């Protein structure tokens, strides 16, 4: 599977309480169950009015389908080509 970063424009998401975030995660998980093994949610980073979600997926189409089922927008989908970290400097 490929790795993607999905930007989701969600007004005031950074002010959501823990319960609201838990409900959002439950909604996302329910959509993932419907889609099966072609997609996996890794983690999400919450900013003021958007989230940056990391997913493993077969292709971009399954990410768009997840957005449709969950009701969360996929404002921008970017495939991750490579990853680097501080240890990259030593290699």
Where is each model-derived feature located?
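A broadly tuned preference for mixed-charge, low-complexity surface segments
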Residues: 2-8, 52-61
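Amphipathic, hydrophobic secondary-structure cores in small proteins
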Residues: 41-54, 61-63
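Short S/T/G/P-rich N-terminal loop/turn motif that feeds into the first structured element of a domain
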Residues: 1-33, 40, 82-91
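Short amphipathic alpha-helical patches
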Residues: 29, 51-55, 59, 75, ...
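A short linear hydrophobic-aromatic micro-motif
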Residues: 37-43, 76
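Residues within well-formed alpha-helices
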Residues: 24-27, 52, 66
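An amphipathic, aromatic/His-enriched active-site/gating alpha helix that lines ligand/cofactor pockets
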Residues: 56-83
């Amino acid at each position: 599977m490929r790795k993607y970063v999905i930007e989701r424009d969600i007004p005031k998401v950074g002010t959501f309480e823990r319960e609201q975030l838990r409900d959002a995660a439950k909604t996302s998980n329910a959509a993932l169950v419907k889609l099966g093994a072609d997609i996996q949610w890794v983690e999400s980073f919450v900013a003021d009015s958007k989230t940056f979600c990391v997913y493993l997926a077969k292709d971009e189409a399954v990410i768009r389908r997840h957005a449709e089922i969950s009701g969360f927008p996929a404002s921008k989908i970017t495939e991750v080509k490579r990853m680097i970290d501080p240890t990259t400097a030593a290699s």
